[in-house]
């Protein structure tokens, strides 16, 4: 019976393979045309919408995006302001199109995030820090991500912060560890570059030798396997040799690229750029034994076909069918040779992905599910024990796909350093289906065993050590508690509340579970979605037990330093103090603070001002005036209570029901009653919104050899003026200056004139000129701004209109009150309607008309 079933399944698989072959033949003739057209589009740096659309419509994976972005960057030399803005826009588009929860373990995705932050550092270093933090949170396992962030902080003069980043990367187990150790050593030696070119080469060579020795023993059971090889093989080996975790999802993505770049020329390191080669660079291109490291066959120039079916113990034959137990996936991989290759650079390798029909693909998946029990690869018993012990120690299944079905993938341990620290690497022993991405994407997480994270465009693995309980059910009397990002499958089912254990590496999933809840001081809140993130915090939209909407801000304190802790404590204190005095301050309803986390239950807004400005192509003058008045009232409130915000920017204001409210007092400073300014130990704030007096002057204002900067309420006026300037002209006053040193000099230079292009609203232009005066003594104050004609929304005409309307109503009622007959009232009302519809008001003629009507009666 089993033999008959096996034969039936073999016939079914053969028929599916024939369908795949037919589809491939159908698209085969289109390969060259697609390649030429795609090259033509990619070469055009002025408009890449065609390539972008093709990437998003086909695979939409990080490799394709990275290839396109590197090509654009190569063609954007020398880098001008316009090209920089275009590059940043493309990188931003790529990040928005790639969900971090899906690609957080992908090297190309990590490089896109890092490079985007580096480009932002060239344009706006103050904003770049947030993007470096985002890259570090999304892709924490890659050492080069942490080093790039540390390099940026070092370039900003924050040596202590740079060292903290590297040390935390070591604690997190980022790979390769040797790269982090070299960076730390160079930092201690006070070198400007954390990694030099020579160190990169030495690091690459030593890592290769160590990895080869380690893998020779670990992969002994694979020595008899013959594998086909593709152009990505060297990249896969390089990633393998760096000891990086490569989940099956990442592997699957890597072999279905429609754009691919094999080699990349070494480029100079601009502002903050970490001198780390791409792992597929020539420096990392190493020769390894094909019997030890699996690879995939490149498609020959003669277009000979090679099916990625691996038969253990025998060489692959030309026959398209094979034994069912040896089948891993059904696919036709075909790649193209590089168009041009030399020692310095190579062109893009164009590969055409074949897209199956939905019906065929779903049928293929169904048949593969039916035959999964026959496809389980044989794994040595010693390795099986190693996987089991590893999974038990971690308490979390890092590969739910491997447990949900029986396509297990060996997890190989590699020694990282002399302290016996280990990292794991998952390498598929069979090829991965190019035509069937849902196999890995749909089964990478098991929805039944994962408490999903509400997220829209959020961090992948950052908030992994939550301590606050999260309820799995909708407000039960006694319920099991977990973390908002936990995976409940690893916990025992109990009736009591179970808290998450420390130091868990939990995977974040983007979609939200409808019954996921958070507990704050015993109150249960049901999470709807994630609405924001930044640094070590995230914001969720939640429902309380009365079905009222709130926002809960979560702050992870495990990586926070003392300054960060103080900033959050100040924020809570300021919110509690100020929300009682103004409705322009965001409301804080409840909070919970521990050594590991902070939860703040706050008023839920619609969108922050920064995001709103980016989405709006043009701003209505009335909206701008209304929001400006809201900002003035909010800042006036904090100034009345002796608080200078010192870091005002659009992101600090939240739109709530059409009203702007001030949020985020993280770095606010409370002034003493007898002082008019605050001397700060370090420069804070955003450069584009930073007042001249807040910029450090190394030649003056020194105390004990340490530079100081002064801030006052007038400093917030400058920042508000920059925000209003942005709302008026679509940019900040000094945004066009890319070089940060030049920008700082321009801000404090009285000879540098700020442009105020003519606008119809002359009172608005006057407000901008009064706010953006470099001398704080000459700068306008908040009370004066509140009394400025621009803020007075046509007070006098409105009063006159109201007065006129009152007189009109009195006149109409006076005319109607003397009429007794319904017909007379109807005629009088009709006459009044005709008069007012024609734009007329009551006058002598209308009075005579009514008098005549009344006389007739």
From Swiss-Prot:
Cross-referenced InterPro entries: Kinase-like_dom_sf, Mps1_cat, Prot_kinase_dom, Protein_kinase_ATP_BS, Ser/Thr_kinase_AS, TPR-like_helical_dom_sf
Reaction it catalyzes: L-seryl-[protein] + ATP = O-phospho-L-seryl-[protein] + ADP + H(+); L-threonyl-[protein] + ATP = O-phospho-L-threonyl-[protein] + ADP + H(+); L-tyrosyl-[protein] + ATP = O-phospho-L-tyrosyl-[protein] + ADP + H(+)
GO cellular component annotations of the record: cytoplasm; kinetochore; membrane; nucleus; spindle
Pfam families named among the record's database cross-references: Pkinase
EC annotation from Swiss-Prot or TrEMBL: 2.7.12.1
Residues holding ATP: 531-539, 553
Record-linked CDD domains: PKc_Mps1
Positions of post-translational Phosphoserine modification: 7, 37, 80, 281, 317, 321, 363, 393, 436, 455, 821
Domain Protein kinase: start-end pairs: 525-791
Regulation of activity: Inhibited by the ATP-competitive kinase inhibitor, SP600125.
Name of this chain's protein: Dual specificity protein kinase TTK
